[in-house]
């Protein structure tokens, strides 16, 4: 498969201004994280390092990986220096990996930015030790027809549509009009986790009139 596109490179400056260091899902993630003090943790699609820094503050030994050199530049500029940032495509075999297993992996609101889900999850199971955990979040896949989500869906399409999309009508100040997203049905996501050798332990839908996000914790079998 061709290398994944680094869609955020063009928008790194804008994205940093737009989201800053706001932690919209940090609290929800924290409820799923096991104890991380002293644990090697890989933050997948780490962007400007928001989750990586949170994990480091909890005492984890953190590495962050991202395809966007521009976003990694933002992460390195903030620090701290004891976080290792890696410029790599997570959908490919992790040639950058030194072979020492990670105890956990995180991926905050990024799997819908990555075209090759199976390749990404293969990286997760490759670098995790047996029993290692994977905590991740995505935009909730189940509500494209809701009032909240309708304007962000491709014209004439619905839940069964799977693929990459952008919408010129959805939140002109937001991220999806710029970088788009890959929609997958809930069954596609759950089956991909299972097929990768990741056993689901817990799912969370943060409270909202219409669930906006889906989070989970899995373990490598």
Residue ranges and their predicted role:
Residues 1-37, 50-54, 71-74, 92, 133-168, ...:
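Conserved class I S-adenosyl-L-methionine
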Residues 42-44, 48-93:
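Class I SAM-dependent methyltransferase SAM/SAH-binding core
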Residues 95-105:
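A short acidic, Gly/Pro-enriched loop at the edge of an enzyme's catalytic core
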Residues 103-117:
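A short SAM/SAH-binding and catalytic strip from SAM-dependent methyltransferases
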Residues 118-133:
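A short glycine-rich, Lys/Arg-flanked "PGG" loop and its adjoining helix->strand segment in the class I
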Residues 179-203:
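Short alpha-helix
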Residues 196-198, 209-221:
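Core SAM-dependent methyltransferase catalytic element
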């Amino acid at each position: 498969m061709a290398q994944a596109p680094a869609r955020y490179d063009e928008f790194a400056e804008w994205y940093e201004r737009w989201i800053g260091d706001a932690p919209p899902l940090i609290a929800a993630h924290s409820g799923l994280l096991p104890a991380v003090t002293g644990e090697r943790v890989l933050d997948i699609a780490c962007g400007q390092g928001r989750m990586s820094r949170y994990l480091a503050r909890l005492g984890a030994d953190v590495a962050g990986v991202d395809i966007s050199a521009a976003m990694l530049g933002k992460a390195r500029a903030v620090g701290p220096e004891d976080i290792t940032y890696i410029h790599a495509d997570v959908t490919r075999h992790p040639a950058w990996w030194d072979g020492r297993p990670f105890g956990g992996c995180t991926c905050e609101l990024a799997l819908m930015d990555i075209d090759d889900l199976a390749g990404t999850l293969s990286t997760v199971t490759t670098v995790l030790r047996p029993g290692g955990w994977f905590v991740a979040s995505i935009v909730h896949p189940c509500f494209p027809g809701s009032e909240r989500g309708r304007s962000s869906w491709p014209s004439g399409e619905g839940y069964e549509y799977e693929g990459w999309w952008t919408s010129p009508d959805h939140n002109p100040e937001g991220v999806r009009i710029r970088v788009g997203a890959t929609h997958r049905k809930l069954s596609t996501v759950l089956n991909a986790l299972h097929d990768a050798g990741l056993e689901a332990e817990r799912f969370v839908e943060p409270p909202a009139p219409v669930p906006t996000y889906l989070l989970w914790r899995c373990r490598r079998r």
